[in-house]
Amino acid sequence: MRNIKLIIEYDGTAYCGWQLQPNGITIQQVIEESLEKMLGQSVRLQSSGRTDAGVHALGMVAVFKTQKDLPVRAFSDGLNCLLPPDIAIRDASEVPLSFNPRADAISKHYRYTIYNSKRRSPLTRLNSWHLRGILNMELMQLGASHFVGEHDFAAFRASNCVAKTTIRRMFHVSVAKVGDSVIIDVHGSGFLKNMVRVIAGTLVAVGQGKLDPSAIPGLLAGGDRSASGITAPPQGLCLMEVFY
């Protein structure tokens, strides 16, 4: 038996997220169906996590087991011939059977992109949140610094989040202006459902002058989701890399 690790890039616009669902097409479903067509066997992917509908990935990690005696390169090349244009295998490698992409992950890097311009851009509408008003970068950067470290992120998660613990450690949270885009990078040990999107929504409130950056430690300590910013729309979010 072999354990094949895939690094997957996808545009999540047309999908109901990563994970298999009964009432919608998902990225996992499309890849599994392509693998079954290629290998002639039933395949179940095990991933490093999940992404919601409309969220993208540059570095989703997933593994599957097979007894097929094919060169590793054949798995990525074969899949890329079968997959639709919005899903691609960036790399394939053979890993120990014990490798678990979720349990063995040390940290993850997410990026949230805001297109900050008075004019809308058709070319960025599927991978960024369009905001017309001016955002104060200095205040957003100050706000971002308060998320670094180990905190209880109960106030920065979806209402239906069922995580056993809401404690997470953030190694790096930054805000940068690149042309008309505002880039929020978040690198942490793990994430709650919608956590990065709520952090982004909160930092936008700071940039708009609706929330003082000094209020963020109180939000973290209070654990009240209603006191934090809105959940930023999904299309601005991208899973950049999973670290092992």
Curated annotation (Swiss-Prot):
Substrate binds at residue 110. InterPro entries: PsdUridine_synth_cat_dom_sf (IPR020103), PsdUridine_synth_TruA (IPR001406), PsdUridine_synth_TruA_a/b_dom (IPR020097), PsdUridine_synth_TruA_C (IPR020095), TruA/RsuA/RluB/E/F_N (IPR020094). The active site is at residue 52. It catalyses: uridine(38/39/40) in tRNA = pseudouridine(38/39/40) in tRNA. Its EC number is 5.4.99.12. Coiled coil: none annotated. CDD domains: PseudoU_synth_EcTruA (cd02570). GO terms for biological process: tRNA pseudouridine synthesis. Keywords: Isomerase, tRNA processing. It holds the Pfam family PseudoU_synth_1. It is an enzyme of class 5 (isomerase). It comes from the Bacteria. GO terms for molecular function: RNA binding; tRNA pseudouridine(38-40) synthase activity. Belongs to the tRNA pseudouridine synthase TruA family. Formation of pseudouridine at positions 38, 39 and 40 in the anticodon stem and loop of transfer RNAs. HAMAP family: TruA. Homodimer. This is tRNA pseudouridine synthase A. It comes from Geotalea daltonii (strain DSM 22248 / JCM 15807 / FRC-32) (Geobacter daltonii). The gene is truA.
